[in-house]
From Swiss-Prot:
Topology in the lipid bilayer: Single-pass type I membrane protein
Name recorded for this polypeptide: Cadherin-16
Gene Ontology cellular component terms for the protein in this record: basolateral plasma membrane; extracellular exosome; plasma membrane
Purpose: Cadherins are calcium-dependent cell adhesion proteins. They preferentially interact with themselves in a homophilic manner in connecting cells; cadherins may thus contribute to the sorting of heterogeneous cell types.
Organism: Homo sapiens (Human)
Ranges in the topological domain labelled Cytoplasmic: 808-829
Main localization category: membrane
Length: 829
């Protein structure tokens, strides 16, 4: 038993699947069929098992049709019931189905296309019975000036609707019966070549043409119709126009009318072409317009071609040419040329040398004032108080030349030149042109030394070759590095090649070096003259005095360093030795040939001192703090007095001894002597006790020091001469004149003596002799007696003068009338 679900699936699947669409059937029925009806057209492939169904014939919309078609249910034929008119309907779209009473489709739909076959049952018709046309003289032959229109309702594309046009007659037939030609297929009426030549001689008249249209193409049979064409011959108005001048930047309402053309013939269409393309247009009446402002600088002239054409775009005649000239106005600024790279001008170029030539472009009309450009130099301006300028500009040519003011190398000058149109007149435009000028350097400066005299330079004769003697520096005022390259040479003063030069190629510094050994005996001095010159060729005046420099070299004699008689020295001293105690004498190994100056180094305690020239070493102070058995080391340095740089040194070791028992200080009187104050250049010799047999206990040497009294040490100075004598002088410039007793301590080994030196300090005369104060001499007047004598003498003189004047007065009273010169003088007693 089959399941219910499987049976339902089998039933529903065929209904769900789409049915195949039957192919369309095409049936042709002749138009205006004259036979019996109904006319069986075709048998449809109906199914056999569909006898129970109903055949339904419908139109292309699916609705049942009541037209001239029907279905024979018995035979299954499609039939037409009456004649069909193709011009009424050319095709019928039908579909046939087999349906149940409830509308269920058992078969179909079957599409059927019924085409009505055309037959020549229509007569062609002209669109007009009478055509009127105007023909202008000058129309080209073969160019249609009238198109005849005719129609045929038969099926298009068949011979039934294939029309042909013909001219049947022309009236009048003069001057030629074939004045016109008619294109058979298009119906285009044109002037024939013969008519074109005859038309010029023909009078202005109207021609009537009888034209025919026939269907069936070129077959002899067919339907036909006729019409009349009236052609009026008129004079040509297609004449050239004068050039049109339009101002650029014209401020009017656009489009702006500028001209008009006219083709006197009929059916004309105007076409405008602009060369180059421009803002122009033409309307149907032949009016020419400009549609916007013109720019002469963009396009100065246009060539317009206006064509008169028929409806098919064919020219009736040659196109008219119209020249449109754009008139210039001053609406453009002079444009300076692009700024070139910097223009280089050598310094010292003569006046009039052309620097550059400016050529400003003005886009206005060439040759007109609008484009007439002149030039004016704006910068640099003339300097105050200076005549002339460094640059000049020719106003017409724009040539920039050098002026009378000189230029300096290294200058970078920006020239500002004003370019003006309208020849500089008021109201014109202007631009500022820039020209950068660089003044290049030339080799017009000779190098010179900054110092012409160097030295004297001292060199020891043992200096090594290669030693730098001097560094010379030369400068060159030129700016170009190639012009600053220098060559150096020794011009004179070095015949033996003792010296040499070395320098860097791009440097102005040259080193004078020693090449050979110096010899003081051969040449104690040298004067080396060094010359400098430019490597590049010099322009202008040659080198001056500064191109040479003189180096003076002094050769120093080399002295061997001094040498002491010992490599080291030692001395012993009791720790109780007083200041000034003699220790030892430092001597050179060759004391005759050179003089040395001695000094102590590293005397940190300050216990010792050394005589500069004698080399005697003494204690400078008491040896406080020294212990017996200790040593004290200092360095003795000896310098050559003539060559301080030459020196020698040796260590001095002092051994401290135990102090011996202090002996009694013995006073030894010394005879008095005198010294002058203010101090003069002499002193007193103090002898040691060795000359006094009572004080001497042995032979020298002795050491001499002043006593410990601070006043004595301030006022007096004691200098040891040798081992037995000392020299006493004043330490101050002024010491009170009187007798002074100076204690001098003399020591020898462990013994000490004190000498009392009596010194009379006095004023001295010019001969250095002492002037002493003396007492009152016997019989010498006193001061009081001297004053009394002086007063008595003065009183006696006064009394005597009074007596003389009294006597003279009395003598004048005795003889008053006698002249004074007649009175004899009286002798006076």
């Amino acid at each position: 038993m089959v399941p219910a679900w499987l049976w339902l699936l089998c039933v529903s699947v065929p209904q769900a699947l789409p049915k195949a669409q039957p192919a369309e059937l095409s049936v042709e029925v002749p138009e205006n069929y004259g036979g019996n009806f109904p006319l069986y057209l075709t048998k449809l492939p109906l199914p056999r098992e569909g006898a129970e169904g109903q055949i339904v014939l419908s139109g292309d919309s699916g609705k049942a049709t009541e037209g001239p078609f029907a279905m024979d249910p018995d035979s299954g034929f499609l039939l037409v019931t009456r004649a069909l008119d193709r011009e009424e309907q050319a095709e019928y779209q039908l579909q046939v189905t087999l349906e149940m009473q409830d509308g269920h489709v058992l078969w179909g739909p079957q599409p059927v296309l019924v085409h009505v076959k055309d037959e020549n049952d229509q007569v062609p018709h002209f669109s007009q019975a009478i055509y009127r046309a105007r023909l202008s003289r000058g129309t080209r032959p073969g160019i249609p000036f009238l198109f005849l229109e005719a129609s045929d309702r038969d099926e298009p594309g068949t011979a039934n609707s294939d029309l042909r046009f013909h001219i049947l007659s022309q009236a009048p037939a003069q001057p030629s019966p074939d004045m016109f030609q008619l294109e058979p297929r298009l119906g285009a009426l044109a002037l024939s070549p013969k008519g074109s030549t005859s038309l010029d001689h023909a009078l202005e008249r109207t021609y009537q043409l009888l034209v025919q249209v026939k269907d069936m193409g070129d077959q002899a049979s067919g339907h036909q119709a006729t019409a009349t064409v009236e052609v009026s011959i008129i004079e040509s108005t297609w004449v050239s126009l004068e050039p049109i001048h339009l101002a650029e930047n014209l401020k009017v309402l656009y489009p702006h009318h500028m001209a008009q053309v006219h083709w006197s013939g009929g059916d004309v269409h105007y076409h405008l072409e602009s060369h180059p393309p421009g803002p122009f247009e033409v309307n149907a009446e032949g009016n020419l317009y400009v549609t916007r402002e013109l720019d002469r600088e963009a396009q100065a002239e246009y060539l317009l071609q206006v064509r008169a054409q028929n409806s098919h775009g064919e020219d009736y005649a040659a196109p008219l040419e119209l020249h449109v000239l754009v008139m210039d106005e001053n609406d453009n600024v002079p444009i300076c040329p692009p700024r070139d790279p910097t223009v280089s001008i050598p310094e010292l170029s003569p006046p009039g040398t052309e620097v550059t030539r400016l050529s400003a472009e003005d886009a206005d009309a060439p040759g007109s004032p609008n484009s007439h450009v002149v030039y004016q130099l704006l910068s640099p301006e003339p300097e105050d108080g200076v005549e002339g300028r460094a640059f000049q500009v020719d106003p017409t040519s724009g040539s920039v030349t050098l002026g009378v003011l000189p230029l300096r190398a290294g200058q970078n000058i920006l020239l500002l030149v004003l370019a003006m149109d309208l020849a500089g007149a008021e109201g014109g435009f202007s631009s500022t042109c820039e020209v950068e000028v660089a003044v290049t350097d030339i080799n017009d400066h000779a190098p010179e030394f900054i110092t012409s005299q160097i030295g004297p330079i001292s060199l020891p004769e043992d200096v090594e070759p290669g030693t730098l003697v001097a560094m010379l520096t030369a400068i060159d005022a030129d700016l170009e590095p190639a012009f600053r390259l220098m060559d150096f040479a020794i011009e004179r003063g070095d015949t033996e090649g003792t010296f040499g030069l070395d320098w860097e190629p791009d440097s102005g510094h040259v080193r004078l070096r020693l090449c050979k050994n110096l010899s003081y005996e051969a040449a104690p001095s040298h004067e080396v003259v060094v010359v400098v010159q430019s490597v590049a060729k010099l322009v202008g005046p040659g080198p001056g005095p500064g191109a040479t420099a003189t180096v003076t070299v002094l050769v120093e004699r080399v002295m061997p360093p001094p040498k002491l008689d010992q490599e080291s020295y030692e001395a012993s001293v009791p720790i109780s030795a007083p200041a000034g105690s003699f220790l030892l004498t430092i001597q050179p190994s060759d004391p005759i040939s050179r003089t040395l100056r001695f000094s102590l180094v590293n005397d940190s305690e300050g216990w010792l001192c050394i005589e500069k020239f004698s080399g005697e070493v003494h204690t400078a102070q008491s040896l406080q703090g020294a212990q017996p058995g200790d040593t004290y080391t200092v360095l003795v340095e000896a310098q050559d007095t003539d060559e301080p740089r030459l020196s020698a040194s040796a260590p001095l070791v002092i051994h401290f001894l135990k102090a011996p028992p202090a002996p009694a200080l013995t006073l030894a009187p010394v005879p008095s002597q005198y010294l002058c104050t203010p101090r003069q250049d002499h002193g007193l010799i103090v002898s040691g006790p060795s000359k006094d047999p009572d004080l001497a206990s042995g032979h020298g040497p002795y050491s001499f020091t002043l006593g410990p009294n601070p006043t004595v040490q301030r006022d007096w100075r004691l200098q040891t001469l040798n081992g037995s004598h000392a020299y006493l002088t004043l330490a101050l410039h002024w010491v009170e004149p009187r007798e002074h007793i100076i204690p001098v301590v003399v020591s020898h080994n462990a013994q000490m003596w004190q000498l009392l030196v009596r010194v009379i300090v006095c004023r001295c005369n010019v001969e250095g002799q002492c002037m002493r104060k003396v007492g009152r001499m016997k019989g010498m007047p006193t001061k009081l007696s001297a004053v009394g004598i002086l007063v008595g003498t003065l009183v006696a003189i006064g009394i005597f003068l009074i007596l003389i004047f009294t006597h003279w007065t009395m003598s004048r009273k005795k003889d008053p009338d006698q002249p004074a010169d007649s009175v004899p003088l009286k002798a006076t007693v």
